[in-house]
Amino acid sequence: PSLAPHLQAFMGEGGFVGAVVPPPATTLLNAPQYLTGRTLADAAARYIDEKLGGKANVVLLTHDSLEFLAPRFTAMRDVLLAMPGVVIVADISPVTVDKAGGFTTMNTILLANDSIDVVLGADTVVLGALEALRKAGKDRPDQFLGGIDGEPEAIAEIQKGGPYKVTVGLNSAVFGYALGQAGADWLEGKSVPQAIDILPMPISPATLAQYQADLADPAAAYADPSRRGAYLKMYGNICFDTRDRYVNFPWSSESH
């Protein structure tokens, strides 16, 4: 049975509901998927231009079967196909979206293309691809492997300074704090945002220390407008008197 009628009744009585993705909610959080993919692809494009002379053989390890995540890969294609020196040698969804899937898929790709410069996808599959490159002796320090999710193993690879250059993460501590703050503000009778974008953050050697500091102390990050603005974007407002105007549809800032 759906929780929605119970949540709607609770909100009608003045209660606060904070949700990540599914409605209904007083304050709804979501992550813009196209922007998430674009953030990773833009980092790769800069690297290709600055370090690889504008030329690269690229592998996209996708997850297009999950409609929710498909915009990530649309964004990657949009960025990379606009670069004349880039060849997408493989654009494929591993059978399983995990390290084993990435490892198996990359081994297959290497049979036809043994010189790979860039690999993009979810962290778990890209970590598997890195393992395949290493076992085949085809890993190079100047490669750009990049993922999405901010996985600890990906961050450890980035800290080593090898092929893994960036992971795009969502700062869970900061967005969790934001949702808690909205609930606290509501209890004090204040207006709260109707919707919040959880913005993708590229985690690289240059940004890692700040990201980890904000993960450890989300209150300080939230209190600093510029740091908060790097992680969150607020939309609309709702208060007790307008509580019937809650979000009751699958909201995304990228819906047109």
Where are these regions (language model features)?
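Flexible loop/hinge segments that line or gate small-molecule binding clefts
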Residues: 1-35, 57, 151-160, 164
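Periplasmic-binding protein-like
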Residues: 1-8, 59-60, 90, 113-123, ...
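Hydrophobic alpha-helical segments within soluble ligand-binding/sensing domains
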Residues: 11, 27-55, 71, 102-103, ...
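Short, solvent-exposed amphipathic alpha-helices that sit
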Residues: 36-43, 67-87, 105, 128-132
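Short beta-strand elements in bilobed, periplasmic/extracellular small-molecule ligand-binding domains
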Residues: 57-62, 77-99, 140
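Hinge/cleft segment of the Venus flytrap/periplasmic-binding protein
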Residues: 61, 68, 178-256
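Hydrophobic alpha-helical
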Residues: 75-76, 95-157, 180
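Flexible loop/turn connectors
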Residues: 144-206
